[in-house]
Amino acid sequence: MKITAVIALLFSLAAASPIPVADPGVVSVSKSYADFLRVYQSWNTFANPDRPNLKKREFEAAPAKTYADFLRAYQSWNTFVNPDRPNLKKREFEAAPEKSYADFLRAYHSWNTFVNPDRPNLKKREFEAAPAKTYADFLRAYQSWNTFVNPDRPNLKKRTEEDEENEEEDEEYYRFLQFYIMTVPENSTITDVNITAKFES
């Protein structure tokens, strides 16, 4: 009987006090970056004008750190001895063996076969040998710098008239290069060949 009376009382109270409904005309206040700066203008004092009773943070100013402090604390990557954190676990590792250029040549003595005695199970590179190219092939493919007609690459973009005009300005230099390639022996020095005299003639 008492339970029924309590339930009836609860229902009557719920009917007497309607649930408040949000007013559709009220718009939430938008916050801007200016509001953020106004409220949180200082991280040290945390003075908040909207919440004056908020407990402020009390702390000592952190000591300024310099590059000298960094070097003092982390003076060695190998031992990682840090005077500010003496209980920090040190890194344990074996020192890597020193490598010399002779070691490099021994391990990678051939780019074609890629035989590496230190890594015998390494997969070797398999490729077809590139066809040998001669100077005749070069002349056949690139017979003209002005038109750049390349029979091996017919769809290659050809040079424009503007390119040709620019190259006419350098014609003297190209003539020198042609003379040098055709007449100067390989491995010769400037004392062996009087380039200026031959070029002017």
Swiss-Prot record:
Location in or out of the cell: Secreted
Keyword terms, alphabetized: Cell cycle, Cleavage on pair of basic residues, Glycoprotein, Pheromone, Repeat, Secreted, Signal
GO cellular component: cell surface; extracellular region
UniProt GO molecular function: mating pheromone activity
Post-translational modification: Proteolytically cleaved by kpr, probably at the C-terminal side of dibasic Lys-Arg residues. Glycosylated. Most of the precursor molecules are glycosylated on at least one site, but only a small proportion are glycosylated on both sites.
Main localization (coarse): secreted
Residues in the signal sequence: 1-20
Domain of life of the organism encoding this protein: Eukaryota
Function recorded in the entry: In h- cells under nutritional starvation, P-factor induces alteration of cell morphology toward mating, arrest of the cell cycle at the G1 phase prior to the initiation of DNA synthesis and indirect transcriptional activation of the sxa2 gene which down-regulates the signaling pathway.
Name this protein carries in UniProt: Pro-P-factor
Organism: Schizosaccharomyces pombe (strain 972 / ATCC 24843) (Fission yeast)
Lineage of producing organism: Eukaryota, Fungi, Dikarya, Ascomycota, Taphrinomycotina
